[in-house]
Amino acid sequence: KPKTLTLEGLGGLTIGQPVPANSSFTAGDGQIGNGCETLSSPEWPGVYAIRTNGEVRRISVADGSGVKLVEGIGPGSTIEDVRAEFPSFREEPHKYTGPGGKYLTQPGDEPRLRFEINPDGKVSIIHVGVMPELGYVEGCA
């Protein structure tokens, strides 16, 4: 399977669409019950998705997923790589990691990319999706 994250989606999941009937992505236990669910799949380690009101709204890829963007950037890439490839992205301080951690977010309203950067300057998670879910800091919150 190609492990390439696009603005459209990944692994049969499409931003703005329901999860396909044959998908291995399912909602696990311990959901908050606010109409938002976190989905994962045994076939896609290190990947999770957010579904709100029946639609996939965000897909996130972390270390161990083996997933990259077409540009070759993935978890473990450097903030310099991200800035060079995506110079227009907005930078904000990370909510949890302390100094040096950042979010780099693609401007606009359509499905967009958002990078979480650790204080060591490496990409920890790449998200694709739409606001407000794209900006959620922990799962459905």
Give a label for each model feature.
Residues 18-52, 79-122:
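A cross-family detector of function-defining hotspots
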Residues 1-20:
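N-terminal low-complexity, Pro/Thr/Ser-rich intrinsically disordered segments
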Residues 54-55, 59-62, 71-75:
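Mid-length scaffold segments of soluble, non-membrane domains
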Residues 12-13, 68, 88, 134:
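Ligand-recognition elements built from short beta-strands and adjacent flexible loops
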Residues 67-85:
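Mature extracytoplasmic domains of secretory-pathway proteins
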Residues 125:
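A motif-centric signal for short, conserved binding hotspots located
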Residues 6-12, 66-73:
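Second-shell loop/turn segments in exported
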Residues 128-141:
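Short, low-complexity, Pro/Ser/Thr/Gly-rich segments in the mature regions of secreted, periplasmic
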